Amino acid sequence: MESSVQNKPIIELRSITKSYGDKTIIENFNLTINNGEFLTILGPSGCGKTTVLRLLAGLEELDSGNIILDGEDITHVPAEQRHVNTVFQSYALFPHMTIFENVAFGLRMQKVPNEEIKPRVLEALRMVQLEEYAYSKPAQLSGGQQQRIAIARAVVNKPKVLLLDESLSALDYKLRKQMQNELKALQRKLGITFIFVTHDQEEALTMSDRIIVLRKGHIQQDGSPREIYEEPKNLFVAKFIGEINIFNATVLTRVDEKRVRANVEGRVCDIYTNLDVVAEQKLKVLLRPEDILIEELDENQSSKAIIGHVADRNYKGMTLESNITLDHNGMTVLVSEFFNEDDPNIDHSLGQKVALTWHEGWEVVLSDEE
């Protein structure tokens, strides 16, 4: 029974369009969000992600289309009457009020009886582990604590959906990492649908059940973090999510249903793809830095692999990154290897000749969009 409730759509955006003047930001946009889901809308600045959030919150009016919340059409329902709350990047806490009064503010505006307010506020503060700061002022709290207070204020009204607009971007790196874990744990505890807007790919991959990648108001890919990272649907998604190497390939022939023989940066090899291809067709072969295997060669040693030379090395703690310049065309390839101080073969010298390969089937093959 619980599973069916969780899979029930809580929000449906049906063919929504929004323009500012003569500039269309979102056009014929459709999206279904399930109950209890942590969904991230990810994209570069100007892609329309914040516009979608503001439309959901009722802070902007649609030009056309419909917004359905839990089966009810709320397209023309004012923001204050929607069961949706928003946590903004600035947190917007009232500096002259105590933390208790900040969290209680929305309840008082809704004329909730006084005897209900105190237990609800304290429960919300307990959820974010800040009950002991109830009678402090916002200025006495750290940035991370203020962020949690903003969340407590948003959830005390028991919304059906919580919207978060780049709400971790003001925090320093270490605190942001900590808050990513806390926010996801809180979402699981509350069971409320979270819709998080960010341009930070790492945040999206860390916290989300599902990611929507947006570009110029259009969905480029909709999937789990793993699908988005390991199986990008186009070059935009591939380039936007993490580091990736993009090799040029030319089709030679199809070997079987799964494999195509191709020339990949001077190396003839079999690549896995179900694309309908013809001889001489141009393709792109995509590989994450951690998926590439590197082998040192003597300078006069030949190999059927892609050949290059080590141009730079960067120690990253858990990993060692190598920039490899390909002999074939001077292209730079990024290779990431897990650091093992007992492995004598991992710390390659600058100028070292190397062979690059990968495990069959780990590559992503896309049509050449250029």
UniProtKB/Swiss-Prot annotation:
Subunit-level organization: The complex is composed of two ATP-binding proteins (PotA), two transmembrane proteins (PotB and PotC) and a solute-binding protein (PotD).
Entry membrane topology: Peripheral membrane protein
The protein's name: Spermidine/putrescine import ATP-binding protein PotA
Residue ranges constituting the ABC transporter domain according to the UniProt record: 11-241
Task of the protein: Part of the ABC transporter complex PotABCD involved in spermidine/putrescine import. Responsible for energy coupling to the transport system.
Alphabetized SMART domains for the sequence: AAA
EC number: 7.6.2.11
InterPro entries: AAA+_ATPase, ABC_SmlMolc_Importer, ABC_transporter-like_ATP-bd, ABC_transporter-like_CS, Mo/tungstate-bd_C_term_dom, P-loop_NTPase, PotA-like, PotA_ATP-bd
Keywords: ATP-binding, Cell inner membrane, Cell membrane, Membrane, Nucleotide-binding, Translocase, Transport
One annotated GO molecular function: ATP binding
Catalytic activity: ATP + H2O + polyamine-[polyamine-binding protein]Side 1 = ADP + phosphate + polyamineSide 2 + [polyamine-binding protein]Side 1
Name of one Pfam family that matches: ABC_tran
Family stated for the protein in its record: Belongs to the ABC transporter superfamily. Spermidine/putrescine importer (TC 3.A.1.11.1) family.
Coiled coil: none
Residues that hold ATP according to the record: G43, P44, S45, G46, C47, G48, K49, T50
Compartment(s): Cell inner membrane
A single cellular component GO annotation: ATP-binding cassette (ABC) transporter complex
Organism placement in taxonomy: Bacteria, Pseudomonadati, Pseudomonadota, Gammaproteobacteria, Pasteurellales
Domain of life: Bacteria
Keyword Nucleotide-binding assigned: yes
